[in-house]
Amino acid sequence: MTSPQNDLLSLATPYALHALSHAEAADIDRALNDAPPGVADAFLAEVRAVRETMAALASATAVEPPARMRDAVLRQIAEDPVRTLPVRSSSRRRAAAVLSAAAAVVIGLGTLAVGYALRPAPTPSTAEQVFAAPDVRTISGEIPGGGTATVVFSREQNSGVLVMNNVPPPQPGTVYQMWLVDADGSHSAGTMDAEAVAPSTTAVLPDLGSSRALAFTVEPPGGSTRPTTPVFAELPLT
């Protein structure tokens, strides 16, 4: 049985994505007022991390649609009849709302998304599936030397999304290497050279497996098969 405090924290992601009804959001606001300071702080920290992550994903993936797209979308809206959608249960509606909110931010097409709602939805990206997962978790931590790293992950989807904000790039002749750490050791999750590290940097982490942490080291160009320098940052994936 989960505690009311854990139930509250589990709603941080849909709250951050505005995927709840007004009544549900109001209930959460009241619960936050009555929650212990530590629980309220953890909830607000996760909300902030999710919104920063989605903003970074939107910035990294946004594209400028061609001018003809707007005309085509508006023409299709005018031609298509209005359809009534069936009412779904609260839990299914919430999951769909989370996926819809995540997709809208990541795709970054603003009001043009209305036109696409009238057509079959594209296959959700890994990031969208992670954010829509019922077991989605958000972990954030400070990086020595400056900046923060946030991992949004789902065991159900076996994937995660890493966002680094204001992390300085590695020194010339080195790369940052990420490692998924499990009982058998450290397994490479990719590298980032100086050109890859921007004010907001995103990366997908597939195949989390049984990893319990995401660790960072500094390695030679191209990376290493195992860590050759001390871990300078680590985020628990629990």
UniProtKB/Swiss-Prot annotation:
Q: Which GO terms describe its cellular component?
A: plasma membrane
Please give the chief subcellular localization of this protein. membrane
Q: Where are the transmembrane segments?
A: 98-118
Tell me the keywords, alphabetical order: Cell membrane, Membrane, Transcription, Transcription regulation, Transmembrane, Transmembrane helix
Q: So which stretches are on the Cytoplasmic side?
A: 1-97
Membrane topology designation: Single-pass membrane protein
> What terms describe the molecular function in GO for this protein?
sigma factor antagonist activity
Q: Which residues lie on this side of the membrane: Extracellular?
A: 119-238
Q: Which InterPro entries match?
A: Anti-sigma-K/W_factor, Anti_sigma_zinc_sf, RskA_C, RskA_N
Which BP terms from GO are recorded? regulation of translation
Q: Where in the cell is it found?
A: Cell membrane
Q: Report the Gene3D superfamilies cross-referenced here.
A: Anti-sigma factor, zinc-finger domain (1.10.10.1320)
Keyword Transmembrane (UniProt): yes
Task: Please provide the record's free-text comment about the domains of this protein.
Answer: The cytosolic domain interacts with sigma factor SigK.
Q: Which PANTHER family match?
A: ANTI-SIGMA-K FACTOR RSKA
Q: What does this protein do?
A: An anti-sigma factor for extracytoplasmic function (ECF) sigma factor SigK. ECF sigma factors are held in an inactive form by an anti-sigma factor until released by regulated intramembrane proteolysis (RIP). RIP occurs when an extracytoplasmic signal triggers a concerted proteolytic cascade to transmit information and elicit cellular responses.
Provide the family line. Belongs to the anti-sigma-K factor family.
Name of the protein in question:
Anti-sigma-K factor RskA
Q: State the organism named in the record.
A: Mycolicibacterium vanbaalenii (strain DSM 7251 / JCM 13017 / BCRC 16820 / KCTC 9966 / NRRL B-24157 / PYR-1) (Mycobacterium vanbaalenii)
**Which gene does this sequence derive from?**
rskA
